[in-house]
C-alpha cells in the first residue's frame, strides 16, 4: 500500500478527481428498466452569471441528493443547462455596444442577434465550468440551453396550442412597464420597496362650482390621464351628484362621477380618481363603467402629447410642475407625508409605471386550478410544508400573465400579421402568405418572457414534444431544489405547464432552501460590499469545505448566516478526517483486511459498531426527509468525536499489542467504520471522501458508484453501547478534574471508583480503557466510600463516583493560591460587565449585538466563578 502524503492537498486532488469522474462517465444516466429513476433538473443559471454563493448552496444541495440516490441504487439523473435570460443578456450586450458607440436600432435585429449569440458562445459556458469546480455531478452529456433547437420547438408548440385553446390572447390591458429596459414585465418581475413620499389632496370642482370632491393621490402626474371620479354606490354623501361631472384642476377637462363598489367609503373622503391607463384597479373600474382610456406616459417615462403643456417632461418633472400649478389655482387642499410600496423592475430597479399597452397574455385562472389541486392532493409536496401556503396565496389570486417583452434576445412570438387585411396568424412554422387574402406577412417584433420557456424546463429538456425514451423514463422528475424567492417566477409556472401540457405533475417534491446572508444577517450585495466569491473560497479552503459549511448551516427553508469561520471549521474537519484515515491505513499496511469477527468484539468494538448502525439509520432517514443539515452534522459529530477522539484512541493499545487475531479484527473494524463514514459523508464532501476511499482495501473503482451503507442487525449492541457511554462519561469527568486542578498530563492518577452491582462488573472490564484515556496508573473499584482518604477530590459520573488523591500530584497550597487569584480576576470581570449592563446610558446607546455579547461574557464569568469556588472548597477540605 502506497504511503499517503502527510497533508491533504485539496487543489491537486479536486482537479485530478473531477477530470477522472467526467472522463469515465460516472455522472451519466441512461433509462434502465432494472432501476428506479431519480431526476433533478437544475434551475438553469443565466448565461450572464458567474457562480455566486446562492448558486453554491443550490447546487450543493442538489448534488448531495443526486449522489445519495446514485449510491442508493437509483438511476440518478441531474440534468444541467443554462437560461438565455432575455432582459439580463440584452442589457449586457447593449452596455457592451454603448462602449463602442453603437445603438441596437442602428444595426438592426439580425446583426444584434448575431452579437448576442457570439456573446453567449464566449461567456455563456463560464458558469458551467464554475459548477464543475464545486464538484457538481451533472450529466454534462445532456446539457441544455433554453434557446437550443429542442427547447425552442417546445416553446413554439405550447404557445400555438394555448392560443388555439383561447388561453393566450393579445389585447390592450394594464401592464407593468419598465421605462429603463423599455419592456413589459409580469407581476412576478416587479419588486416592491417601501419609499417615503407624500399624499397630495386635490379638489375637483363642479363646472359651476356648486359642489366639489376632494381626492388623495400619491401620483399627481397621473391626474393628466383621469377619466372619472368614483364613489361607492351606497355612500349617501355623494348620491345626489353621481352621474354629474367635475373639472380636472388646471387641465380643464370635464370627467364624470361614477359609482363603483371598488371604492371604500370609510377611507379618506370616500372618493378616488380613476386613471384607467395607469393603474390596474382603475383599469378594472374603467371596464365596468365604460370609461375612456387616456395613456399620458411615453415608453421612456415622459409625458406624451395628451399631456398638453406638460408634454416632454419626465414623470417626476411633471409631478413637480403640475402640483405647483394646482396649488396656484387654489385646488391643492393639503400635502401629507406618506410611506407606501413602490414597484421597481427586478432587473434594473427603476420605478415601474403601470400603463395600458397592447401585449400578449396567458389566461391564468383556468390553468391555475389543476396546478392548485395537484398540490392540495399531496401529489406535489413542499418541503418545508409552510411554503405551500405561499404557493396557494399566489395561485388563488393570480392575474393574467403578460408574456410579451419588447426585446430582441429571446423566443420570438410565433404570431404573424397581414400587411393588407390585418389578419393575425399564430403558427409553429412561418406561413409564406396570408391564408385569408394572400397578402404579405410580418412577424410580431416581441419575444416571450424568459420564464415562459423555463416553465417547460422539466419536459423540454427530456425531448418533448418528441416522444423520447428519456422523457418516458425520467419524467415526471423527482425533486426540485430552489430558493423561496422564485416560487412565483418559476415553480408555479412549471406546475402549470406540467399539468396543462403533460397532464402530469413535473416533480413530486419541491425542496425550498433559504437565502445565504452575511454574518450580521444582511442580504449579500455589491452596495454593502459583503458578497463572498465561492471560487476564492474553493481556491483557499477547497470545494468540500465550502459545500459542508453551506449544508450544515442551512436548515430547509431558513436563511443562513455565512462567514469564513464556518468554512475554516469544515476545513479543519477535512484535516481531522484525513489524519484519521492516514492512521487507519498505516496500521493496515499491506495486511489483508477480512470480515469482522463478532465473537472477538470487546465493549469498545460493540459500542462503535452500534453507533455506526445508529448513524446509518438516522442519516438515511434525514436524507430521505430532506434534513440534509442534520445528516451532515451527525456524520461530522460521529467522525470527529466518536471515531477519531474515542474509538481510534481505544483501539491503539490493542493495535500495539501482541494478539494478532485481535489486531486483525480491530483493523477490520477500523476499515469498515472508516469506509462507511466516507460513504455517509460523500454526498457533502465528494472529493476528500473519494481520495480516501480509493486508498482503502477492497474499494470499488469510485465511491459514488458504491452502495450506500446499510445497518446490520448483528451489530446492534444497545446495552454494551450504554455501558461504554458511561465509561466515557467517567473518563470525561476525570479529565475535567485534571484540567481544573492543573494536573500535568505526565502525572499518572490513582483512582478509586465507588459503584456496585452490574455496573461494577462492567467497569471492571473497562479498566484498561479508563487507565489509558484518563491517564491513570491504578484503578480500584469498591462498593462504598469506606477507606477513601480525606485528601481527595471527587468527580460524579453516571456509572460511578471517582475519588482521586491530589497531594502527590500537585502542590495543594500553590494550587489554592492560583485558584484564588483566578477567582479574583473573574470577580473583577463580573463587576465590570455588571456595571456596564446596569448603566442605562450603555444599554440605551450600545448596539443590540454589543449588549448581547456583554450578557454572554457575564454569564460565562459567573459560571467560571462557580467552578473555581467549588474546586477551592474541595482543596480547603483536604
Where are these regions (language model features)?
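Feature 926 captures the class I aminoacyl-tRNA synthetase adenylation module centered on the KMSKS loop
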Residues: 201, 393-452, 456, 500-543, ...
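Short Cys/His-rich metal-coordination motifs, predominantly Zn2+-binding knuckles/fingers
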Residues: 181, 251, 348, 419-421, ...
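Short acidic-hydrophobic surface loop/beta-edge motif
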Residues: 200-206, 244-249, 343-347, 416, ...
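Short glycine/proline-rich turn/loop motifs
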Residues: 41-47, 375-385, 470-477, 558-559, ...
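Active-site-adjacent bridging/hinge elements
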Residues: 34-42, 64, 101-103, 128-135, ...
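N-terminal, positively charged nucleic-acid-binding surface of large information/translation enzymes
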Residues: 1-234, 258, 275-288, 292-307, ...
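Structured ligand/cofactor/substrate-binding pocket environments in proteins
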Residues: 54-66, 82-83, 151-154, 212-327, ...
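Catalytic cores of large soluble enzymes that bind and process phosphate-bearing ligands
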Residues: 5, 9, 13, 53-57, ...
Amino acid at each position: 500500500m502506497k504511503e499517503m502524503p502527510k497533508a491533504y492537498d485539496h487543489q491537486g486532488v479536486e482537479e485530478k478527481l473531477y477530470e477522472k469522474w467526467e472522463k469515465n462517465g460516472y455522472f451519466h444516466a441512461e433509462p434502465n428498466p432494472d432501476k428506479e429513476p431519480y431526476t433533478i433538473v437544475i434551475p438553469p443559471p443565466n448565461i450572464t452569471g458567474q457562480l455566486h454563493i446562492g448558486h453554491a448552496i443550490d447546487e450543493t444541495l442538489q448534488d448531495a441528493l443526486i449522489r445519495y440516490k446514485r449510491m442508493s441504487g437509483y438511476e440518478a439523473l441531474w440534468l444541467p443547462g443554462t437560461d438565455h435570460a432575455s432582459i439580463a443578456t440584452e442589457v449586457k450586450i447593449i452596455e457592451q455596444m454603448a462602449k463602442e458607440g453603437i445603438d441596437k436600432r442602428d444595426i438592426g435585429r439580425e446583426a444584434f442577434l448575431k452579437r448576442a449569440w457570439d456573446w453567449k458562445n464566449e461567456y455563456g459556458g463560464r458558469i458551467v465550468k464554475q459548477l464543475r469546480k464545486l464538484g457538481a455531478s451533472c450529466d454534462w452529456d445532456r446539457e441544455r440551453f433554453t434557446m437550443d433547437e429542442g427547447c425552442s420547438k417546445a416553446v413554439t408548440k405550447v404557445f400555438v396550442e394555448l392560443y388555439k385553446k383561447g388561453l393566450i390572447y393579445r389585447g390592450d390591458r394594464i401592464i407593468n412597464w419598465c421605462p429603463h429596459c423599455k419592456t413589459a414585465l409580469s407581476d412576478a418581475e416587479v419588486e416592491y420597496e417601501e419609499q417615503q413620499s407624500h399624499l397630495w389632496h386635490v379638489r375637483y370642482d363642479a363646472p359651476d362650482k356648486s359642489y366639489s370632491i376632494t381626492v388623495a393621490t400619491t401620483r399627481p402626474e397621473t391626474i393628466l390621464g383621469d377619466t372619472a371620479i368614483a364613489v361607492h354606490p351606497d355612500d349617501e354623501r355623494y348620491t345626489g351628484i353621481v352621474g354629474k361631472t367635475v373639472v380636472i384642476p388646471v387641465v380643464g377637462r370635464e370627467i364624470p362621477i361614477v359609482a363603483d363598489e371598488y371604492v371604500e367609503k370609510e377611507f379618506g373622503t370616500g372618493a378616488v380618481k380613476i386613471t384607467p391607463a395607469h393603474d390596474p384597479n382603475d383599469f378594472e373600474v374603467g371596464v365596468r363603467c365604460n370609461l375612456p382610456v387616456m395613456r399620458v406616459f411615453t415608453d421612456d417615462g415622459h409625458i406624451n402629447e395628451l399631456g398638453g403643456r406638460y408634454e416632454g417632461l419626465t414623470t417626476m418633472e411633471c409631478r413637480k410642475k403640475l402640483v405647483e400649478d394646482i396649488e396656484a389655482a387654489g385646488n391643492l387642499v393639503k400635502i401629507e407625508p406618506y410611506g407606501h410600496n413602490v414597484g421597481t423592475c427586478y432587473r434594473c430597479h427603476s420605478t415601474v409605471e403601470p400603463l395600458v399597452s397592447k401585449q400578449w397574455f396567458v389566461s391564468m385562472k383556468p390553468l391555475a386550478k389543476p396546478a392548485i389541486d395537484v398540490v392540495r392532493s399531496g401529489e406535489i409536496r413542499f418541503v418545508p410544508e409552510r411554503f405551500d401556503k405561499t404557493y396557494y396565496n399566489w395561485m388563488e389570486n393570480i392575474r393574467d400573465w403578460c408574456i410579451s417583452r419588447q426585446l430582441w434576445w429571446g423566443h420570438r412570438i410565433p404570431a404573424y400579421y397581414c400587411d393588407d387585411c390585418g389578419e393575425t396568424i399564430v403558427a409553429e412554422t412561418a406561413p409564406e402568405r396570408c391564408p385569408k387574402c394572400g397578402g404579405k406577412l410580418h412577424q410580431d417584433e416581441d419575444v416571450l418572457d424568459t420564464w415562459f420557456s423555463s416553465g417547460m424546463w422539466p419536459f423540454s429538456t427530456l425531448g418533448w414534444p418528441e416522444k423520447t425514451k428519456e422523457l418516458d423514463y425520467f419524467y415526471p422528475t423527482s425533486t426540485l431544489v430552489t430558493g423561496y424567492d422564485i416560487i412565483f417566477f418559476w415553480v408555479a409556472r412549471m406546475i402549470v405547464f406540467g399539468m396543462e401540457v403533460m397532464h402530469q405533475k413535473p416533480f413530486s417534491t419541491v425542496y425550498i432552501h433559504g437565502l445565504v446572508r452575511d454574518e450580521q444577517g444582511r442580504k449579500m450585495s455589491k452596495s454593502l460590499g459583503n458578497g463572498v466569491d465561492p471560487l476564492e473560497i474553493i481556491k483557499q479552503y477547497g470545494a468540500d469545505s465550502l459545500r459542508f459549511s453551506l449544508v450544515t448551516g442551512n436548515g430547509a427553508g431558513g436563511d443562513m448566516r455565512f462567514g469564513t469561520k464556518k468554512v475554516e471549521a469544515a476545513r479543519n474537519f477535512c484535516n481531522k478526517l484525513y489524519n484519521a484515515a492516514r492512521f487507519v491505513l498505516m496500521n493496515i499496511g499491506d495486511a489483508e483486511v477480512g470480515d469482522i469477527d463478532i465473537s472477538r468484539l470487546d465493549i469498545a468494538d460493540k459500542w462503535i459498531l452500534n453507533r455506526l448502525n445508529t448513524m446509518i439509520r438516522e442519516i438515511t432517514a434525514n436524507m430521505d426527509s430532506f434534513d440534509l443539515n442534520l445528516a451532515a452534522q451527525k456524520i461530522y459529530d460521529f467522525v470527529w468525536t466518536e471515531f477519531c477522539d474515542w474509538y481510534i484512541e481505544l483501539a491503539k493499545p490493542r493495535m500495539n499489542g501482541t494478539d494478532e487475531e485481535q489486531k486483525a479484527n480491530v483493523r477490520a473494524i477500523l476499515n469498515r467504520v472508516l469506509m462507511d463514514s466516507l460513504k455517509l459523508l460523500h454526498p457533502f464532501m465528494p472529493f476528500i471522501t473519494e481520495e480516501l476511499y480509493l486508498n482503502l482495501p477492497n474499494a470499488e473503482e469510485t465511491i459514488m458508484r458504491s452502495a450506500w451503507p446499510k445497518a446490520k442487525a448483528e451489530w446492534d449492541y444497545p446495552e454494551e453501547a450504554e455501558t461504554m457511554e458511561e465509561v466515557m462519561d467517567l473518563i470525561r469527568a476525570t479529565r475535567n478534574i485534571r484540567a481544573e486542578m492543573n494536573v500535568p498530563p505526565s502525572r499518572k492518577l490513582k483512582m478509586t471508583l465507588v459503584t456496585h452491582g452490574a455496573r461494577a462488573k462492567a467497569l471492571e472490564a473497562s479498566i484498561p480503557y479508563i487507565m489509558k484515556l484518563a491517564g491513570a496508573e491504578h484503578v480500584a473499584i469498591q462498593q462504598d466510600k469506606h477507606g477513601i482518604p480525606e485528601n481527595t477530590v471527587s468527580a460524579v459520573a453516571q456509572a460511578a463516583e471517582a475519588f482521586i488523591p491530589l497531594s502527590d500530584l500537585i502542590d495543594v497550597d500553590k494550587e489554592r493560591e492560583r485558584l484564588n487569584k483566578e477567582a479574583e480576576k473573574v470577580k473583577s470581570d463580573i463587576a465590570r460587565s455588571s456595571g456596564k449592563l446596569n448603566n442605562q446610558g450603555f444599554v440605551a446607546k450600545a448596539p443590540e449585538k454589543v449588549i448581547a455579547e456583554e450578557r454572554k461574557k457575564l454569564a460565562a464569568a459567573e459560571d467560571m466563578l462557580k467552578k473555581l469556588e467549588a474546586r477551592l472548597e474541595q482543596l480547603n477540605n483536604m
